[in-house]
Amino acid sequence: EKYGATAFPLDYPNAWDRRLGRTGYGVWVHGMDRRNGQRPRLDTDGCIALPNERLLVLEDTFEPNVTPVIIGAELTWIDASAVAAMREALERAVARWAAALEEGDMFAWLALYDDDFRHWGMNKDEWSTFSLETVGSRDIAAVRISDLLLLADPVEEGLFLARFRLEIVEQGGAAVTTLRRTYWRRSESGALTIIAEANG
């Protein structure tokens, strides 16, 4: 009853949140306690509480790890042509990333990672060495991207999420599919590089 009519899990903190030092776990969007709908505004244990009626409208369309939930203080509309151009640039960047991985061109692949990239406590140089030893040693036959979702960060201008299903097929035929999240940063020159990433 405390969580109302329904609840949906969030991926907070995601890789970018952790990069910024944000902490927490078990964060949900949930309804309000029907027995006492007058809880203090911020009494949600770090979760987001919405009226039950609003959440029930979303219940049939919400899929965990599929439906994007964007939380921001305000909404800004931008020109559709600017959105289309940015989408095209991001799609090309993701395609270059996949092609370099498939071709085994580790230097082109690693060049798509930002100098300020961090992963598993490693800086870019440490992570590059690790990747050359692990990813670079794989005998990859094909890399396939599907279900690509592109989102702009609601707060930080020039930061984008590319979430997709990544299928890597080895030369022997074995295939592994994961859900990959890459966070791309656009530089002043317009170049896109990966600043953070995570599976799941």
Where are these regions (language model features)?
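Short, solvent-exposed aromatic-acidic interface loops
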Residues: 30-34, 166-169, 195-200
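Surface-exposed, charged secondary-structure patches
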Residues: 132-181
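Exported/periplasmic cell-wall-interacting domains
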Residues: 1-95
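Short beta-strand edge/turn micro-motifs at domain boundaries
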Residues: 174-200
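Short, well-ordered alpha-helical segments enriched in acidic and aromatic residues
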Residues: 103-116, 120
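Short, well-ordered strand-loop elements centered on a beta-strand within folded domains, enriched
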Residues: 3-7, 24-26, 161-163, 189-199
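Hydrophobic pocket/interface hotspot
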Residues: 97, 109-110, 127, 162, ...
